[in-house]
Amino acid sequence: MDVVCLDLEGVLIPEIWIAFAEKTGIDALRATTRDVPDYDELMGQRLRIVKENNFKLGDIQKVIEELEPLPGAVSFLDDLREHYQVIILSDTYYEFTRPLMKQLNWPTLFCHKLVTDPEGYVTGYKLRQPDPKRMSVKS
């Protein structure tokens, strides 16, 4: 069986942090790994901004619930699944993706997890594994 691995944001769905930046008007949240290649530095920047602006995970999730897959993404995935095992490898978070995964007919997704406090504030994140995309494809 052949396997096809895809990224998620910017490929099948809009960039989540950019959508949140547009909704909140905070341009600094538009930064992606193209702008800040060091993922830990980028996430530190994002989490600092979210904390400074008193946003909770639920605030981000509300914006995500309004998003839809990019045009053609659902049919593209459905067609791929007829011939291949499809795995999505993403630097996003399970806590972000549920509404979009439903719209994409629940593809297999490997991504990271957010850490939240009892009040719902995002306090950190846990990588699925170091260098996750490269290691997944390598195996």
Describe every region a protein language model picked out.
Residues 128-139:
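Conserved Lys-Pro-Asp/Glu-containing loop-to-beta segment of HAD-superfamily phosphomonoesterases
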